[in-house]
Curated annotation (Swiss-Prot):
Gene3D superfamilies: beta-sandwich domain of Sec23/24, Sec23/Sec24 helical domain, Severin, von Willebrand factor, type A domain, Zn-finger domain of Sec23/24. Zn(2+) binds at residues 56, 61, 80, 83. The gene is SEC23. Keywords: Cytoplasm, Cytoplasmic vesicle, Endoplasmic reticulum, ER-Golgi transport, Golgi apparatus, Membrane, Metal-binding, Protein transport, Transport, Zinc. This is Protein transport protein SEC23. Coiled coil: none annotated.
Length: 760
């Protein structure tokens, strides 16, 4: 079964491609029935229909016409495979033949360009922290000014700058600089802000219709958002004239920085005039919030920033209060249909751990860099505005993902950058048991891109111990993903993907053969990361171990109490090592990482597809030598040899490691001697391959060039399986890794032992 082909066509990968026929049987499988779905996956041959989709008339279904529907040409009707309702086809579908079938009856994934145009262009609201040092602020200003040329000419733009006060800039005046100034230590409310900025009191009736488009006047709230083509010169001038915060910072104190208040004011201004309109709040922060709501740390330097240990031991003084503030703000921003992006440019933590819900529930970007002057920030920020072949931004707005299922399936939840859509009546295909964001069959993505991938989990409805599937035709479970969104071209679009999975009785060998161990590993990793947000890290590791043992007991071949007889079929053989590397990954092992770094790593992991997620779990290692062609090698200390160059890709950084002998030759300058042209080309090969990896990676990875004995070689050694550690003898020519971590060999040996002994 070609799992990757299905992903290329439909953007979906299931853990089990054949489903057990009952819930009891599915529970025995240990790994839940789930899939990784990339709604806007790029395809050259995507079927695009320039008309509205045909929708099922059942008000509780509303699924879309697809290739699995039964068509009755004589009566011009179609039967919905999801709910079995019979529907009348539109008149222009009459008299169709096998040769003239519409796109939606021949393609499992179709994109519809609907007839409803987008009313308001996207809004980009920049929030700039001016407490940055001069060099850092200068680099940031240059990046923002450059990015203006990448925005659509009709895009609306706004600007807030802040230190311990918040300045909301009015771009409507070309001759003078006007701005409204707010206190940074206060949490403003919507009615209060509207009255201050417009002079009008906001009553309940106005609050309901607050998003009604109004003409821009000198006193209207929407005067703060004007078309880029009108105000680009003014905005560029304002940015160029920005100076670092003029307030004196006393010795032993941090700058006063009202980040929480700035974000709150930005969300309120947008809510006041552009609720449920595509908008991005883009924050550039150069340090932690030290004043006002959402305060991360006090201004005094003697008060250190919280660590993981402080958070776990409940001794992080401001953490819970800040999290509560930002979580409530995130819910409000998501409800308004807006997105928050956070770009950090400083060596210190800025409070990403507290603010992560702002980006994770709105489809925003969280980027952690050392400074705004680094290549990582500059190039990642510009890639944020990357465009497709037609010149449109590769970002979609106001997305909604609805998942329709046939009566055999219910939805447990979704793990990804989204928020639940609140509905008046609960959909019939929603399970009582939740994984991730549950209790609904529709999720809201204020923003999404071709990279965004969501983990969706299902429950088999039939509770029977072993439901027999005894029919002439194979029993199929149908799932339809309907993604509605605003395309950056100004059109409303609907991407529909419909898939069918066979259901068989437990024990049928087709179920085991349908196991996609790569997708399963990523789905289980997403559950583990989701659990790690609220559970103790050691408990999450134990849960991972127990599920692996149970899966092996179910699907490995072995004789009881005989570890040497343990065998896993090819469909399962890589799964244990994925689990081993997941246990050691920065997503679960937070030792040596700050809370902000952990938030950043988990944010990126929960938005990427199967391939990129696996690179994060188990990095790839490629060996280059004079004797052999470049080849993948084990992520193991035995792969480190004096006469090879290694290329490590962890997704977050790309490292080139020169073995001891290679490093000596390089220092001696052999590559500059024409006699050693082969050696010169050997040094260039990994750089060329690294450049290939960097082409479309977001965010831009850190690039490390090191050698045996170099200080940065630790970045490689920390990722390797320590089969040669100080506790064991080293293989000749390999490297000893100084660690107390269990090696993969010992991990597998213990797994085999507990599996064959019947332990859990």
């Amino acid at each position: 079964m070609d799992f990757e082909q299905n992903e290329d066509i439909n953007g979906v990968r299931f853990s089990w491609n054949v489903f057990p026929a009952s819930r009891t049987d599915a529970n025995k499988n240990v790994v839940p029935v789930g899939c990784l779905y990339t709604p806007l996956k790029e395809r050259e041959d995507l079927a695009v229909a320039g008309y509205n989709p045909v929708v099922c008339g059942n008000i509780n279904c509303k699924s879309v016409l697809n290739p699995y529907c039964e068509i009755d040409v004589r009566s011009n009707t179609w039967t919905c495979p999801i709910c079995k309702t019979r529907n009348i086809l539109p008149q222009h579908y009459a008299n169709m033949t096998q040769e003239t079938l519409p796109l939606e009856l021949t393609n499992t994934t179709v994109e519809y360009i609907t007839s409803v145009p987008v009313q308001v262009p996207p809004i980009f609201f920049f929030i700039v922290d001016t407490t940055a040092e001069e060099e850092n602020l200068q680099a940031l200003k240059e990046s923002i000014i450059t990015s203006l040329s990448l925005l659509p000419a009709n895009a609306l733009v706004g600007l807030i700058t802040y230190d311990n006060v918040i300045q909301l800039h009015d771009l409507s005046s070309a001759s003078i600089d006007k701005c409204n100034v707010f206190r940074g230590d206060r949490e403003y409310q919507l009615a209060q802000l509207v009255e201050m900025l417009t002079g009008e009191k906001l009553n309940a009736a106005q609050a309901v219709n607050i998003n009604a488009p109004t003409k821009v006047t000198p006193f209207s709230l929407n005067r703060f958002f004007l078309p880029l083509e009108q105000v680009e010169f003014k905005l560029t001038q304002l940015l160029e004239n920005l100076k670092p915060d003029q307030w004196d910072v006393k010795s032993g104190f941090r700058p006063l920085r009202a980040t929480g208040s700035a974000l709150n004011i930005a969300s309120l201004v947008l809510e006041g005039c552009y609720k449920n309109v595509a908008a991005r709040i883009i924050l550039f922060s150069s340090g932690p919030g030290t004043v006002g709501p959402g305060l991360v740390v006090s201004p005094e330097l003697k008060d250190p920033l919280r660590s993981h240990h402080d958070i776990d031991s409940d001794s992080a003084k401001h953490y819970k209060k800040a999290c509560k503030f930002y979580n409530q703000l995130a819910q409000k921003v998501a409800d308004n249909g807006h997105t928050v992006d956070i770009f950090a440019g400083c060596y210190d933590q800025v409070g990403m751990s507290e603010m992560k819900r702002l980006t994770d529930s709105t489809g925003g970007v969280l980027l952690l860099t050392d400074a705004f002057s680094t290549a990582i920030f500059k190039q990642s920020y510009l890639r944020f505005f990357s465009k497709d072949e037609e010149g449109y931004l590769q970002m979609a707005f106001k997305g909604t993902l609805s998942v329709k299922t046939s009566s055999d399936l219910k939805l447990q939840g979704l793990i990804g950058h989204a928020s639940a859509v609140k509905t008046k009546t609960e959909a019939s295909n929603v399970s009582d048991s939740e994984i991730g964001i549950g209790g609904t069959s529709s999720w809201k993505m204020s923003s999404l891109s071709p990279r965004h991938t969501y983990a969706v989990f299902f429950e088999i409805v039939n509770p029977g111990a072993s439901a027999e599937v005894m029919t002439d035709r194979p029993k199929l479970a149908y799932t339809q993903f309907i993604t509605s969104y605003e395309h950056s071209s100004g059109t409303n679009r609907v991407r529909v993907t419909t898939v069918a999975n066979q259901m068989l009785s437990f024990g049928n060998p087709a179920i085991a053969s349908s196991f996609d161990q790569e997708a399963a590993a990523v789905l289980m990793a997403r559950i583990a990361v989701d659990k790690a947000e609220s559970d103790d890290g050691a408990d999450v590791i134990r849960w991972i171990d127990r599920t692996l043992i149970k899966l092996c007991q179910k699907y490995a071949d072995y004789n009881k109490n005989d570890p040497s007889s343990f065998r896993l079929s090819p469909q399962f053989s890589l799964y244990p090592q994925f689990t081993y590397y997941l246990r050691r990954s920065q997503f679960l092992s937070v030792f040596n990482n700050s809370p902000d770094e952990t938030a950043f790593y988990r944010h990126i992991f929960t938005r990427e597809d199967t391939t990129n997620s696996l690179i994060m779990i188990q990095p790839t290692l490629t060996s280059f030598s004079m004797e052999e062609e470049p080849q993948p090698v084990l992520l193991d200390s035995v792969s480190v040899k004096p006469n090879t160059i290694l290329l490590l890709d962890t997704f977050f950084y790309i490292l080139i490691y020169h073995g001891e002998q290679i490093a000596q030759w390089r220092k001696a300058g052999y590559q500059d001697d024409p006699q050693y042209a082969d050696f010169k080309s050997l040094l260039e090969e990994p750089k060329l391959e690294a450049a290939e990896l960097l082409i479309d990676r977001f965010p831009l990875p850190r690039f490390i060039d090191t050698e045996a004995g170099g200080s940065q070689a630790r970045f490689l050694l920390s990722k390797l399986n320590p089969s040669d550690s100080y506790q064991s003898g080293a293989v000749a020519g390999s490297t000893i890794v100084l660690t107390d971590d269990v090696s993969l060999q010992n991990f597998m040996s213990h797994l085999q032992q507990v599996t064959v002994n019947g332990q859990t």
